[in-house]
Amino acid sequence: MAMVKIKDGESFESAFRKFKKSCEKAGILSEVKKRENFEKPSVRLKKKSIAARKRAVKKSRKGWND
């Protein structure tokens, strides 16, 4: 759970910004989006292999990371 300590005299906006940043670092929103709809393990595995293939193609492109 993301928690933020509020200092004396700190505005709501700055506390809210800190909270949003801590949620982003913890990966809470991405986890919620991932769990929003059930995804079969076979579909998850297929997406993972497609992403790995895309990364491999990107790495093998000429001029990448010379």
From Swiss-Prot:
Leader peptide range in chain numbering: none
Gene Ontology process terms (BP): translation
GO cellular component: ribonucleoprotein complex; ribosome
Claim: Ribosomal protein is one of the keywords in the record: yes
GO molecular function, one term: structural constituent of ribosome
Organism superkingdom: Bacteria
Keywords per UniProt: Ribonucleoprotein, Ribosomal protein
Cell inner membrane is among the record's keywords: no
Pfam family, one: Ribosomal_S21
NCBIfam families: S21p (TIGR00030)
Family from the record: Belongs to the bacterial ribosomal protein bS21 family.
Name of the protein: Small ribosomal subunit protein bS21
Phylogenetic lineage: Bacteria, Pseudomonadati, Bdellovibrionota, Bdellovibrionia, Bdellovibrionales
